[in-house]
Amino acid sequence: MDGATIKTQQYTLRRKKGFIMNHDITNEVLTEFSTAFSSNPVNRIAMNAVTSAGLLAASKNPMAQRESRHSYSISLEQGEITNQKQSGRCWMFAALNTFRFEVIKNLNLKTFELSQNYTLFYDKLEKSNYFLESILETLDEPTQGRLISFLLSAPLGDGGQWDMLCNLVRKYGVVPKEAMPETVSSSATREMTAALTRKLREDACRLRKAYADGSTLDELRKKKEAMMEEIYRVLCICLGEPPKTFDLEVTDKDDKFIRDTNLTGTAFFEKYVGLNLDDYVSLINAPTADKPYHRSYSVKFLGNVKEGCPVRYLNLPIEELKKAAIAQMKDGSPVWFGCDVGKDSSRDEGLLDTNTYQTDKLLGITFGMNKAERLEY
């Protein structure tokens, strides 16, 4: 073969320029890599920048900030900024912010905040029950199978969806932040969630072993009730016990004092928020071949309130999604928005922009997948 040799034992093709690597990383291969790296002085400059400043800082694109202005043609009145701190409650904060918009408007307030700790308590409680019920539904599945492994991977993570918050609100309502303020564990959930995750995995183990030993479903549900009592106790210790009733006391923009006593969470929502949650649906843009547009989708074993509505998404082309969001804001209502906020974002500048960083140019590589491919892979 002209210009090439074949070593059949190592399955290596060697050519005049470069080579096709076999299944091993050999010293010869490393030498080739090092020579290629050192031959381009741009690599040395990039290495100096990234090792000193970090990849994102070194690849930040200043033009992205210059071209992104925080001035908008549609601007809705909003209260003071809320802070989820060291927790994964972004979806919950965003939904409660849409609800408090109605409270601020209806009571003529400068600002107002709903208790995120209250909804966190019941979200963790309901997710625990949802998890244990899922374990009871899958007792015949192999322990090492993909389904059980999936269920055990994160029994009650902080994350959630719009429909999950709606399920909580329909059942428990909402309360002012003063009625159930933040705690250390609500603002930094990692330690509490780790303890609950460990306990729920143990509970799953006990339920599956009891089933293997011949326990009936009724007997397993009695065990589950005792397990849920323990979960409730842990949540009370970490987050405090939710109020059954509370008093609303606020002062409006005109310095008028407002008091409403002996309210429940559901009564407060009906009276001061007043939204019909059945009128809302989550819109997504998932341009994958297995999800045709203008259809709704759900994910099995994704939820919190077992008897609640399933998590649903209506898949739309991105332009239709944008039109719907703009129309809702023009109508005077905020839009709940969820995304993979860790991608292409800069907290310092408040940017969510695919041009925020130029890591591909800095590293000399390409990121060529389209959105559908990124969702699939």
Give the role of each language-model region.
Residues 22-79:
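N-terminal regions that are enriched for targeting/export leaders
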Residues 86, 151-155, 189-193, 198-203, ...:
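Active-site-adjacent substructure of cysteine-protease-like catalytic cores
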Residues 193-303:
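Aromatic-residue-lined binding/catalytic grooves and analogous aromatic/hydrophobic interfacial grooves
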Residues 307-311:
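N-terminal amphipathic/basic membrane-interacting segments and domains
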Residues 119-239:
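Internal, well-ordered alpha/beta segment that forms a basic, Gly-enriched binding/recognition surface
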Residues 2-20:
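Short, Lys/Arg-enriched N-terminal segments with co-localized hydrophobic residues
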Residues 93, 101-106, 168-175, 238, ...:
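Structured segments of extracytoplasmic/periplasmic soluble domains
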Residues 57-146, 151-159, 166:
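Long, well-ordered hydrophobic secondary-structure segments characteristic of membrane-embedded
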